[in-house]
């Protein structure tokens, strides 16, 4: 935050690093406040690190944020007495407010935790206080973080031009955020040009359904085509059935390797698609994938999810064969993950859904798919990865 007198350091680690080395690095920085980002792939690691950090830095203030703690923030604080609080949902403005509370400031000295939306925190008397969720922010207000590209050498660049999702897929947290917002195209063009000028190898768009708004998608794809540097690749997650003729014609004209498309089919069982609240026109998916493949210039990655409701082993074989027949460049078989806060979690009893207690909460069995069939599909997953 520009109006707060605080020094912020970004410390990035991976779950493959030695825990002791990370702990030593955190300790050497001697921060007064530490914030951890919590995701499905790092939650166990982060919780263990929080406990260790508090043992060696007893006076440090520790906050957590991210999707893995946003939807059960009270339980997280109960489980981790080392935590002062949890940031729920979007963190940009919430973090800035926390900096005002804890930073060395004068004009905002009256600000207290009780006035900040989007947090759950431990009160001085030990009780847990929960504030309302923060109103979704204007995406054009999100700062651009890639000014110093030396810090991101040999790394994939993750970039966002929209938040929220128009769909309601029951297994996905994006369906909770119904307020679909887009970043200003002027900002997007400037930032894309920055990546192109620096000749970054890949920019991965994290928009949940990039082509849900035709004008937005076309403007960005046209800019990428017209300013192609011959090096940078752009990755998009799209709904293939939403692609229209104009978009497909443009995609077919692009340099081989300029963009790649990830298409989540998940299942071709109509009962499954209906039950998970997904909207998909399979024949249009098939037709559009074929039209793009015909030109041979675009890498297409298609996804399936095992363990969805109404999908038994026989049904999944058909889904697999249907997607395989589309001849994608890559077919990925994943397994249902029952995410906190998702509708799938609410329906676990009705679906007789059994899943692992630890992240990533992967399915073990359902009313339609016994564990013996999950084992068989695991073998298929390994073969798909190899070949």
Predicted segments, located by residue:
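Conserved C-terminal portion of the radical SAM core fold
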Residues: 33-35, 61, 196-206, 231-237, ...
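Short, solvent-exposed turn/loop segments enriched in Gly/Ser/Thr/Pro and often Arg
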Residues: 13-14, 39, 208-212, 240, ...
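Short helix-loop-beta junction
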Residues: 1-7
């Amino acid at each position: 935050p520009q109006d707060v007198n605080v020094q912020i350091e970004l410390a990035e680690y991976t779950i493959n690093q030695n825990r002791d080395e990370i702990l030593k690095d955190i300790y050497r920085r001697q921060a007064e406040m530490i914030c951890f980002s919590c995701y499905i792939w790092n939650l166990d690691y982060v919780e263990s690190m929080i406990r260790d950090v508090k043992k060696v830095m007893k006076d440090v203030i520790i906050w957590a944020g991210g999707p893995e703690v946003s939807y059960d923030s009270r339980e997280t604080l109960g489980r981790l007495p080392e935590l002062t609080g949890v940031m729920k949902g979007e963190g940009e403005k919430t973090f800035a407010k926390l900096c005002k509370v804890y930073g060395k400031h004068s004009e905002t000295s009256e600000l207290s935790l009780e006035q900040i939306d989007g947090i759950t925190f431990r009160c001085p008397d030990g009780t847990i206080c929960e504030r309302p969720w923060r109103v979704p922010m204007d995406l054009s207000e999100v700062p651009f973080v890639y000014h110093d590209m030396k810090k991101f050498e040999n790394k994939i660049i993750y970039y966002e031009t929209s938040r929220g999702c128009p769909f309601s897929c029951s297994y996905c947290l994006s369906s909770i955020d119904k307020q679909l917002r887009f970043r200003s195209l002027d900002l997007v063009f400037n930032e894309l040009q920055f990546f192109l000028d620096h000749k970054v190898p890949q920019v991965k768009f994290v928009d949940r359904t990039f082509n849900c708004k035709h004008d937005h998608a076309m403007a960005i794809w046209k800019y990428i085509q017209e300013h192609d540097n011959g090096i940078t690749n752009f990755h998009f997650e799209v709904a293939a059935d939403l692609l229209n003729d104009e978009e497909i014609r443009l995609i077919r004209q692009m340099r081989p390797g300029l963009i790649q498309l990830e298409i989540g089919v998940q299942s071709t069982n109509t009962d499954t698609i209906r039950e998970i609240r997904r909207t998909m026109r399979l024949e249009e998916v098939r037709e559009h994938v074929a039209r793009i493949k015909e030109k041979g210039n675009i890498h297409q990655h298609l996804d399936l999810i095992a363990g969805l409701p109404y999908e038994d082993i026989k049904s999944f074989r058909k889904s697999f064969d249907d997607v395989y027949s589309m001849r994608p460049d890559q077919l990925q078989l994943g397994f249902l993950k029952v995410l906190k806060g998702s509708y799938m979690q609410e329906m676990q009893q009705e679906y007789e859904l059994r899943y692992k207690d630890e992240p990533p909460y992967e399915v073990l069995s359902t009313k339609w798919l016994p564990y013996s069939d999950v084992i068989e599909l695991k073998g298929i997953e390994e073969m798909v990865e190899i070949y």
